[in-house]
Amino acid sequence: NMIFEQLFDTKSSTYTYILSSGKGREALIIDPVLEHTDQYINFLNKLELKLVKVIDTHIHADHITGLNELSERTNCTKIMGENSKSEVVDLRVKEDENVKIDNINLKVMYTPGHTDCSYSYLMNDRVFTGDTLLINGTGRTDFQNGNARQQYDSIFNKLLKLPENTIVYPAHDYNGKKPVSYTHLTLPTKALV
């Protein structure tokens, strides 16, 4: 049974995702927050998961990534898109490449706009959009080499062209109305048009 965990950091309003094909298998984390590293490690240990890959959808301005700490503690591979200027990355991925663990496959989509290094990751009927597309809005484009035209193109010509039942999993919910226990902030793409 696939493990799919969505965690929320109230301080930075960040969503982190833990994926695995099942108990005792390999795991992958998307957009980890440094302060929650122990929580992630405990979750992994409880389910006997081996963290092999960790992804940041882009360079985050609102929180410190947990990439380095997780890599130091688990020896996992740190992944970002090829346009990332981060110097701590082990593997840079590009459009249409795949990030795989066991039988889970994430297709890489370059979705600039919020930043020039924003990437989304498509997993079957789910898409992890980072800050490019949020549930009730989009990420800012006025800093970090953001570009409103690119953002529009990424949203309307890539993300919203996915099948309409594709579920959007963003990196943030800035409304701040969701308690930590509210664990599935999502919408199908058809509801966002």
What is each of the regions a protein language model found here?
Residues 162-180:
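Anionic-ligand binding patches
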Residues 145-168:
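An active-site-proximal "capping" alpha-helix that borders the catalytic cofactor pocket
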Residues 52-58, 111, 129-130, 171, ...:
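Ser/Thr-glycine-rich phosphate-binding loops at phosphate-binding pockets of nucleotides
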Residues 2-50, 120-130, 136:
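Conserved beta-strand hairpin/beta-sheet module of binuclear metal-dependent hydrolase folds
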Residues 183-189:
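Conserved small/polar residues in nucleotide/adenosyl-binding loops
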Residues 18, 98-123:
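Core dinuclear metal-dependent hydrolase active-site scaffold
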Residues 32, 59, 83-84, 115, ...:
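Active-site metal-binding loops of divalent metal-dependent hydrolases
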Residues 13, 24, 34-110:
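Active-site HxH/HxHxD metal-binding segment of metal-dependent hydrolases
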